[in-house]
Amino acid sequence: AASQEASKPKANGAAAKNKSNGTPFETAFRNIDDALWKDPGCTSELDYTEQTSWILFLKYLDDLETVKQMEAELQGKKYTPIIEAKYRWPVWACPKGKDGKLDHHKALSGPDLVGFVNQQLFPYLKGFKQKATGPNTIEYKIGEIFSEISNRVQSGYTLRDVLEHVDALHFRSQEEKHELS
């Protein structure tokens, strides 16, 4: 493992640790790269990008669902989220207490988190492809995405760290969405 880590590119490495300036997105991405660099399942920049992407996608999707739900409520309508409750970001990725902070008693970590992601979350999301009414639906696209990738993060503690960094990001305003691009 030590020789594997020595051969890994350092992404943003030590230089990033000395820089705290930058946008919240830049800071989060540096922290995510630093966390993934330590994981034995992520051995290249391509791995960092793929793993960061699926996590960001699920956070983005949950923020989008939250906005749609709020808009429906303002119009006196009911909105049913695409993702079942137990697979929504605030339930599995970053459950919060009444104070709005991460509830460490409910938050999965270590082998429990990796087990949930690999054995429940990914199979659930892959199943969207079969349930979709057509290839142009968001459900089909979700299923297609999660049929093509896998969770490579082996440490549930690393994954917990990455989830917390991503959770600090929000994709609710146009400015926030633009910053991500």
Report the location of each language-model feature.
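Non-catalytic, mostly N-terminal accessory regions of nucleic-acid modification and defense proteins
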Residues: 1-181
